[in-house]
Amino acid sequence: INSKELAITHLFAVPAPLQFMMQHPEFNSTDFSRLINVGVGGAPCAEIIIKTWQSKGIDVIQGWGMTETSPAGIFLAAEDSLNKIGSAGKAVLHTEIKIVNKNMKAVELNEIGELLIKGPNVTPGYWNNEKATKESFHEGWLKTGDLAKFDSDGFVFIVDREKDMYITGGENVYPAEVENILYQLDEIAELAIIGIP
């Protein structure tokens, strides 16, 4: 990164290595001036990671996708990285997304539901597995298993995996939200929140 001749200009990573780099003793003294942007995806990214890299003057570009979406489905453009921290962005070209409740009805703005996606980049089904295909699709829409919400500008915020949510005290608790809060503590290097019955 410090080499004038060989310095990288673009970096893509899942959140963990970005966090590990932040914890390196030389992180604060490293010259990141040639690094234009950091792309992050593959797992929920704690806001502290986004804010820390952005404080270095680096655009953090987030995205969401899965193998079934070849792989991109949602993308947050660099110009939105500061004003939409925590968002995965908007649907990629020729792709449609919606967020629905358990009855497959569209949810209101800022209401959490399951993210559905369809488009030419989305698989038509699972090879030789009609059961999995039937369970994973609803009227041509892929049911992702991810919980998300739209803000008033149409940006998608991934909340967590549906199977990771747990209920305590009558409240829905999303591990990623708890992790985002705990990551703000200097004493926390790495953590994972798991609901135990």
Question: Model-found features: residue ranges?
Answer:
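AMP-binding/adenylate-forming catalytic core of the ANL superfamily
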Residues: 11-14, 103, 119, 124-125, ...
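Residue-level signal for well-ordered alpha-helical positions
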Residues: 2, 24-25, 129, 169, ...
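Conserved ATP/PPi-binding loop(s) of AMP-dependent carboxylate-activating enzymes
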Residues: 74, 90-94, 105-136, 171-173
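Alpha-helix capping/helix-boundary segments
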Residues: 17-18, 45, 122
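Gly/Ser/Thr-rich phosphate-binding loop
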Residues: 3, 8-13, 22-83, 96
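Active-site glycine-centered loops adjacent to acidic/histidine catalytic or metal-binding residues
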Residues: 42, 65, 89, 146, ...
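Short loop/turn microsegments at loop-to-beta-strand junctions
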Residues: 94-96, 139, 144-145, 189
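Hydrophobic alpha-helical segments, especially N-terminal targeting/anchoring helices
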Residues: 100-101, 109, 144, 150
